[in-house]
């Protein structure tokens, strides 16, 4: 699929801009800007990613069904903030849970490992296929803002890997492409953007993202697309039903 056209100096969001590249995906991008971007994702994710809702409605029930200590995996964990938050929420609810974050980018893993350590949380430089091939299994598998980075073929691979890795729940969260989401992010991210890739890459992320209808067409059997909050979508496989 070709990148979106630009009309009158403005990007159209009618179709997904799959060929559009984010600055932080460049291996030669400025390391300080990348580090600031990953570190500031902590606040960005708290503000826009609706993980509180997803935890209450999806993750917590899956953990409650686990017969003993539970394991949580974050695919493409970046700086690790979502994983740390989910583990903290689960422990506050009384669950005995450990976490693993994986990312194929050594720069992201370095930022995650440099963050405040959390007992029972580790980060590995690997991808979902290699981890699944190793025989690792987790009660809950998640990702945050990973799907829009992927081609349809790569997305299917990650979904297949997730089904192999998860024993109870696999869930991938991302932004839903829309003009309103684009406009709101363009304004709202301004205070956090200086010295980072947050503005440029965030807007490109929205242009690369799927709409719920587009994503639903790519779902294998057993998966479905849900809308947990405005501008958000999740791909879900509940393995307990």
Indicate where each model-derived feature is located.
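Class I SAM-dependent methyltransferase SAM/SAH-binding core
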Residues: 73, 79-130
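N-terminal, positively charged/glycine-rich alpha-helical extensions of SAM-dependent methyltransferases
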Residues: 1-39
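C-terminal alpha-helical "lid/dimerization" subdomain adjacent to the S-adenosyl-L-methionine
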Residues: 175-218
């Amino acid at each position: 699929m070709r990148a979106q056209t630009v009309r009158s100096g403005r990007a159209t969001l009618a179709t997904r801009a799959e060929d559009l590249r984010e600055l932080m995906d460049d291996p030669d991008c400025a390391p300080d800007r990348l580090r600031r971007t990953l570190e500031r994702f902590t606040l960005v994710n708290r503000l826009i990613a609706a993980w509180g809702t997803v935890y209450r409605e999806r993750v917590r029930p899956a953990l409650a069904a686990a017969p003993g200590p539970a394991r949580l995996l974050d695919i493409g964990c970046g700086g690790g903030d979502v994983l740390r938050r989910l583990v903290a929420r689960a422990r506050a609810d009384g669950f005995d849970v450990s976490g693993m974050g994986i990312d194929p980018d050594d720069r992201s893993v370095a930022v995650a490992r440099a963050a405040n350590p959390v007992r029972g949380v580790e980060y590995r430089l690997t991808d979902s296929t290699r981890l699944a091939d190793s025989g690792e299994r987790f009660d809950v598998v998640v990702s945050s803002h990973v799907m829009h980075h992927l081609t349809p073929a790569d997305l299917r691979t990650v979904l297949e890997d997730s089904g192999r890795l998860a024993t109870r729940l696999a869930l991938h969260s991302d932004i839903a492409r829309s003009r309103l989401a684009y406009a709101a992010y363009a304004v709202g991210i301004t205070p956090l953007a200086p010295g980072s890739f947050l503005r440029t890459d965030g807007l490109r992320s929205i242009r690369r993202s799927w709409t719920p209808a587009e994503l639903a067409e790519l779902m294998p059997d057993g998966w479905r697309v849900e809308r947990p909050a405005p501008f958000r979508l999740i791909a879900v496989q509940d393995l307990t039903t």
